[in-house]
Amino acid sequence: MQYLFVFIGGLFGALLRYVLSTLNVDSGLPLGTLIANIVGAFLMGYLSSLSIHFFKNNPLIKKGVTTGLLGALTTFSTFQFELVTMSQNNSIALLFIYGLTSYIGGILFCWFGVKLGGQPT
């Protein structure tokens, strides 16, 4: 049964990820990927902390939201590919700005989500 919940969550996460990818414009900054990863990091921290109370009696929903929805929404492989592409295009300044913003922003937003959600699990 958990596979069904992960599948459904993944379906919505993938659709949301696709919609966000339309924000990637020719500016060179993959805004859709940045937003997906930052929002996903925040929600993972928030929902993981909140899960002690909210998902206590619903572990299948937790699995569907965290592994399914957030797993499909966020993307490390696309992030890495975008960094390599920036390197190949000699966009070194953008590579560092995007890379550091994504990495540090993801950690900060995850931490902020944990703090808002309560005690970590």
Swiss-Prot record:
Na(+) binds at residues 71, 74. Pfam families: CRCB. Keywords: Cell membrane, Ion channel, Ion transport, Membrane, Metal-binding, Sodium, Transmembrane, Transmembrane helix, Transport. GO terms for biological process: cellular detoxification of fluoride. It is a multi-pass membrane protein. The keyword Iron does not apply. One of its GO terms (molecular function) is fluoride channel activity. It catalyses: fluoride(in) = fluoride(out). The keyword Zinc does not apply. One of its GO terms (cellular component) is plasma membrane. Na(+) is not transported, but it plays an essential structural role and its presence is essential for fluoride channel function. It is found in: Cell membrane. It comes from the Bacteria. The chain crosses the membrane at residues 3-23, 27-47, 64-84, 92-112. Belongs to the fluoride channel Fluc/FEX (TC 1.A.43) family. HAMAP family: FluC (MF_00454). Fluoride-specific ion channel. Important for reducing fluoride concentration in the cell, thus reducing its toxicity. This is Fluoride-specific ion channel FluC 2.
